[in-house]
UniProtKB/Swiss-Prot annotation:
GO terms for biological process: rRNA base methylation; tRNA methylation. Reaction proceeds by a ping-pong mechanism involving intermediate methylation of a conserved cysteine residue. This is Dual-specificity RNA methyltransferase RlmN. Residues 99-331 form the Radical SAM core domain. PANTHER family: 23S RRNA METHYLTRANSFERASE, RADICAL SAM CORE DOMAIN-CONTAINING PROTEIN. Binds 1 [4Fe-4S] cluster. The cluster is coordinated with 3 cysteines and an exchangeable S-adenosyl-L-methionine. Belongs to the radical SAM superfamily. RlmN family. [4Fe-4S] cluster binds at C113, C117, C120. PROSITE patterns: RADICAL_SAM. GO terms for molecular function: 4 iron, 4 sulfur cluster binding; metal ion binding; rRNA (adenine(2503)-C2-)-methyltransferase activity; rRNA binding; tRNA (adenine(37)-C2)-methyltransferase activity; tRNA binding. It comes from Coxiella burnetii (strain CbuG_Q212) (Coxiella burnetii (strain Q212)).
Length: 370
């Protein structure tokens, strides 16, 4: 007996292939996209513009399954955080951040993260596995149905648990559905992928997906970035910055956004701002300064308001479009850097994955004078 297929786990071309295998015309794929993503219907018997024989055929060959809601918390500032349970009992977190007329959904791409960035809570939990397409787009599907008026998803950022470009195929397929007119219909300007700088995948993304790009920079030189983002030892700034400079075509109004977490005494001094100005001198970009969010076990502290203000002014005086991304949802552990998955890596998957990459991102790093 042929195993049933989760239609939520199919990209548009794969869905068309499935429809063809059922002897149906391709426009049925469009109808299914609309029923599943726009109307949120998962019961084939309710898809009334499909013939009864085809609905029966679908129920025998396929199903639609999204992650389960395990926990919901709502912050005083309107931020929503959901803990979703996957079929294998792993859990991921998704956050919705309302802001005036904008509603941004922060989506996870992996269970945990292997990069072990020293300022991020998620990395401390280790890496378990990549999410499937169904588990990524399922977060959007669920959030759209869980949110109550007046909240609405206008933007999606791939900034949740995990490094999106280390789960390339599933992430790009999910973003395509986010932008698809018959699914979620978001503009390419409203879907953003954030990466720590996986250079080969960034080059591929530039050619294959029109989404907006954000880069987790967080340091003005390699010495400090090696401490904050160990991936930098593999893909250093002399590779990353030229790619960011040329990521969008000349004359384009689009530019890369750099994210820079503000950590007291680590990367928030005036000399750090001046080094950052030199580093990005010829790079069309925007800069988001992110106050560090503390988590259990970290020795880092957030920069003071005055230090952040001085840092921002220095960058703006040099001509950089710079804003401070204010902390949201910190009363429910939903702010950036606090997306620690509630699981324990008992299987050794994390170390096996790291070894497969040929680089030990978790090797202890000696103290340096940056």
């Amino acid at each position: 007996m042929t195993e049933k297929i989760n239609l939520l786990n199919l990209s548009e071309p794969e869905l068309q292939g499935f429809i063809a295998s059922q002897g149906q015309p391709l426009y049925r794929a469009t109808q299914l996209l609309q029923w599943i993503h726009q109307r949120g219907v998962t019961d084939f018997s309710l898809m009334t513009d499909l013939s009864k024989p085809f609905r029966q055929q679908l129920s025998e060959a396929s199903f639609v399954r999204v992650p389960e809601l395990a926990l919901e918390r709502v912050s005083a500032d309107g931020t929503h955080k959901w803990l979703f349970r996957l079929a294998d009992n792993n859990k991921i977190e998704t956050v919705f951040i309302p802001d005036r007329k904008r509603g941004t959904l922060c989506v996870s791409s992996q269970v945990g993260c292997a990069l072990n960035c020293s300022f991020c809570a998620t990395g401390k939990e280790g890496f378990n596995r990549n999410l499937t397409l169904a588990e990524i787009i399922g977060q959007v599907w669920l959030a759209a149905r869980l949110l109550k008026s007046p909240y609405k998803i206008t933007n999606v950022v791939m900034m949740g648990m995990g490094e999106p470009l280390l789960n390339y195929e599933a992430v790009v397929a999910a973003m395509h559905l986010m932008m698809h007119d018959h699914a979620y219909g978001l503009s390419k300007y409203r879907v953003t992928l954030s990466t720590s700088g996986v250079i080969p995948a960034m080059r591929r993304l530039r050619e294959e997906s029109p989404v907006s790009l954000a880069v987790s920079l967080h340091a003005p030189n390699d010495a400090l970035r090696n401490v904050l983002i160990p991936l930098n030892k593999k893909y250093s700034l002399d590779q990353l910055i030229p790619l960011c400079r040329d990521y969008y075509s000349r004359g384009s109004k689009r530019c890369v956004t750099f994210e820079y977490v503000m950590i007291e005494g680590m990367n928030d001094r005036l000399i750090d701002a001046k080094r950052l100005i030199r580093l990005l001198a010829d790079v069309p970009c925007k800069i988001n300064l992110i106050p560090f969010n503390s988590f259990q076990g970290t020795a880092y502290r957030c920069s003071t308001e005055s230090a952040i203000s001085v840092f921002q002014k220095c960058l703006m005086d040099a001509g950089f479009n710079t804003r401070v991304r204010r902390t949201r949802g910190d009363d429910i552990a939903g702010a950036c850097g606090q997306l620690a998955g509630q699981f324990h890596d008992r299987t050794g998957r994390h170390q096996r994955w790291v070894q497969k990459q040929g680089h030990d991102f978790n090797r202890p790093i000696p103290a340096i004078d940056h």
